[in-house]
From Swiss-Prot:
This is Phenylalanine ammonia-lyase. It catalyses: L-phenylalanine = (E)-cinnamate + NH4(+). GO terms for molecular function: phenylalanine ammonia-lyase activity. The modification 2,3-didehydroalanine (Ser) is found at S212. Pathway: Phenylpropanoid metabolism; trans-cinnamate biosynthesis; trans-cinnamate from L-phenylalanine: step 1/1. (E)-cinnamate binds at N269, Q357, R363, N393, K465, E493, N496. Homotetramer. Contains an active site 4-methylidene-imidazol-5-one (MIO), which is formed autocatalytically by cyclization and dehydration of residues Ala-Ser-Gly. It comes from Medicago sativa (Alfalfa).
Length: 725
């Protein structure tokens, strides 16, 4: 019987052997200090989320993606998927030997009579069957997996988007380059050529459960490579190509491939379609997360919010890094903002004009967004690990001369990450809708007109009322999409695939969520720009009203009928306080109307002064009551003309007071929307609808044009909150 000490010695020896073996295997990297990869995962999360997004954007714009199997990023996948700036794919020559070795091992193993899954056996629940016709087996694999429906001749489109297909091709190449899959390097080169020539195989939209990988859609890439008659592709201009035409256009100077043992399985048994689409989704999700932080800050500006909600101590005491960063980003935008300075003065004039604290959609936006940023960031890292993983079965370990039968094809990281991301997107959308609802509601928006209407006649301008209804629709659909996909697993393939990830389905639903959040973001930003312009108009109109009231007060209240100084001259200061405190859009359509608050409160000032005028009121020459009618008549004569003059000057681009936004850190986004996209102030007098303007921004957002102005808003941020003073 073996002694305990002997057993320990033996185990230590075996452990040392395994580590030495791993170090000597060129295809494997073992970190003795971090054998479970938790350290690597934690290291990847260092630094700010914004810096990571900036790196993503920079990487997205590089002209070449060099594949080696282990360094692919989601931004590179997104770049190849979009192919909007001609980015090309290069394969690392250093990977050729490893790929070749695993391919040769499969052939040698079969020639020796070794029994290997998918090489000499059937597939899945029927793997008990055996054959020596390895090539024919691969051919049959592709045939029976071509089970997708495209809906040709119907109105429905059941073809996977080209972007997702291109992403899948790139990810599958990257996986196979690691040399554990038993496939010829020439096949990987052949998949690369259509990517570089924008020739895209047609894959079915549905039909995969992403375990055992994305079998059905990936089989159509294999079908094109093998020249199956049902294979189709799209050319650069969208033209439909058969397999031969696709080969010619892609520059594949070879006949269709006759797949060797294991090669068909290597092509189809992976998670590339789900993880490819997930990469595209997460690139956009990271941009939208930063955008939501900046839009929350702009919302605070136009709502005359109190900036203390971003104070670093508050968020430091909560400890969550996403929250701390979200608050710091908002703090940076608001620091030095002209809107914040003006709001501070306003709050000092009348502390009771608005609640002591802003509502939750403004005040708790960092606490709301922070965890969502963390979820999106963690999901990004999870998918980045997945697209650099070897995820087929069996795996060929040439160094140990064996095929490993496992389950890396299980795409659970995709399904879970996409479900979590979709939930985060829905929560961002909910915050955005709450902010939008406050912005258009004159009970909550601190003086902006109802529905953000900008016309002279508000009874014929309902502004963003339709947009608010649309936002409710978007938000409802987005929240419905937040329901998890991964809880709907069905047992498949004769109960062999009895648990499966549904990774691609979840990625597809998250892609839908991205689109809806982009609709919401574009609508919200157009509304914020409207609010910015209304604040500018408000300031100019108030200035005109204030000057006119001052002018009329001096003219009518300073002197008595006999040329003596009149007691009513002391009313001017209080009259101007009324103008300062009263919301312009509450009266500006008819500024002298006796039913509107301005006229009522101006009169009240004169009445109050008259009541304390004492005995002087009994004298006609010194009576303030006697001046009220004169003051009001003069104001009615002058004020409407001056208000119209101020509005006309504003509309012609020559306002007396410049727009505060010009000196704010949020200006690049405003400038992009107004100048680059050519949008303007929406009014009922104008034929342009809100949807037309939102459409311009949505299209630009889908093309990535919002990224530069967004990052420009944060260009001066040093990655840290302001010091606690």
């Amino acid at each position: 019987m073996e002694t305990i000490s002997a057993a320990i010695t033996k185990n230590n020896a075996n452990e040392s052997f395994c580590l030495i073996h791993a170090k000597n295997n060129n295809n494997m990297k073992v970190n003795e200090a971090d054998p479970l990869n938790w350290g690597v995962a934690a290291e990847a999360m260092k630094g700010s989320h914004l810096d990571e997004v900036k790196r993503m954007v920079a990487e997205y714009r590089k002209p070449v993606v060099r594949l080696g199997g282990e360094t692919l990023t989601i931004s590179q996948v997104a770049a190849i998927a979009a192919h909007d700036h001609g980015v090309q794919v290069d394969l690392s020559e250093s990977a050729r030997d490893g790929v070749k070795a695993s391919s040769e091992w499969v052939m040698e193993s079969m020639n020796k009579g070794t029994d290997s899954y998918g090489v000499t056996t059937g597939f899945g629940a029927t793997s008990h069957s055996r054959t020596k016709q390895g090539g024919a087996l691969q051919k049959e694999l592709i045939r029976f997996l071509n089970a997708g429906i495209f809906g040709n001749g119907t109105e429905s489109n059941h073809t996977l988007p080209k972007t997702a297909t291109r992403a899948a091709m790139l990810v599958r190449i990257n996986t196979l380059l690691q040399g554990y899959s038993g496939i010829d390097f020439e096949i990987l080169e052949a998949i690369t050529k259509p990517l570089n020539k924008t020739v895209t195989p047609c894959l079915p939209l549905r039909g995969t459960i992403t375990a055992s990988g994305d079998l059905v859609p990936l089989s159509y890439i294999a079908g094109l490579l093998t020249g199956r008659p049902n294979s189709k592709a799209h050319g650069p201009s969208g033209e439909v190509l058969n397999a031969k035409e696709a080969f010619n256009l892609a520059g594949i100077n070879a006949e269709f491939f006759e797949l060797q043992p294991k090669e068909g399985l290597a092509l189809v048994n992976g998670t590339a379609v789900g993880s490819g689409l997930a990469s595209i989704v997460l690139f956009e999700a990271n941009i939208l997360a930063v955008l939501s932080e900046v839009l929350s800050a702009i919302f605070a500006e136009v709502m005359q919010g109190k900036p203390e909600f971003t104070d670093h101590l508050t968020h430091k005491l909560k400890h969550h890094p996403g929250q701390i960063e979200a608050a710091a980003i908002m703090e940076h935008i608001l620091d030095g903002s002209s809107y914040v300075k003006a709001a501070k003065k306003l709050h000092e004039i009348d502390p009771l004009q608005k609640p002591k604290q802003d509502r939750y959609a403004l005040r708790t936006s960092p606490q709301w967004l922070g965890p969502l940023v963390e979820v999106i960031r963690f999901s990004t890292k999870s998918i980045e690990r997945e697209i650099n993983s070897v995820n087929d079965n069996p795996l060929i370990d040439v160094s140990r001369n064996k095929a490993l039968h496992g389950g890396n094809f299980q795409g659970t990281p995709i399904g879970v990450s996409m479900d979590n991301t979709r939930l985060a997107l829905a929560s961002i959308g909910k915050l955005m809708f709450a902010q939008f609802s406050e912005l258009v509601n004159d009970f909550y928006n601190n003086g902006l007109p109802s529905n953000l209407s900008a016309s002279r006649n508000p009874s014929l301008d309902y502004g963003f009322k339709g947009a608010e209804i649309a936002m409710a629709s978007y938000c409802s659909e987005l929240q419905y999409l937040a329901n998890p996909v991964t809880t709907h697993v069905q047992s498949a393939e004769q109960h062999n695939q009895d648990v499966n990830s549904l990774g691609l389905i979840s990625a597809r639903k998250t892609n839908e969520a991205i689109e809806i959040l982009q609709l919401m973001s574009s609508t919200f930003l157009i509304a914020l720009c409207q609010a910015i312009d209304l604040r500018h108009l408000e300031e100019n109109l108030k200035n005109s009203v204030k000057n006119t009231v001052s002018q009329v007060a001096k003219k009518t209240l300073t002197m008595g009928v006999n040329g003596e100084l009149h007691p009513s001259r002391f009313c001017e200061k209080d009259l101007l306080k009324v103008v300062d405190r009263e919301h312009v859009f509450a009266y500006i359509d008819d500024p002298c109307s006796a039913t509107y608050p301005l006229s009522q409160k101006l009169r009240q000032v004169l009445v109050d002064h008259a009541l304390v005028n004492g005995e002087s009121e009994k004298n006609f020459n010194t009576s303030i009551f006697q001046k009220i009618a004169t003051f009001e008549e003069e104001l009615k004569t002058l004020l409407p003309k001056e208000v119209e003059s101020a509005r006309t000057a504003y509309e012609s681009g020559n306002p007396t007071i410049p727009n505060k936004i010009n000196g704010c850190r949020s200006y690049p986004l405003y400038k992009f929307v107004r100048e680059e996209l050519g949008t303007g102030l929406l009014t009922g007098e104008n034929v342009i609808s809100p949807g037309e303007e939102c459409d311009k921004l949505f299209s630009a957002m889908c093309q990535g044009k919002i990224i530069d102005p967004l990052l420009e808003c944060l260009g001066e941020w040093n990655g840290a909150p302001l010091p606690i003073c």
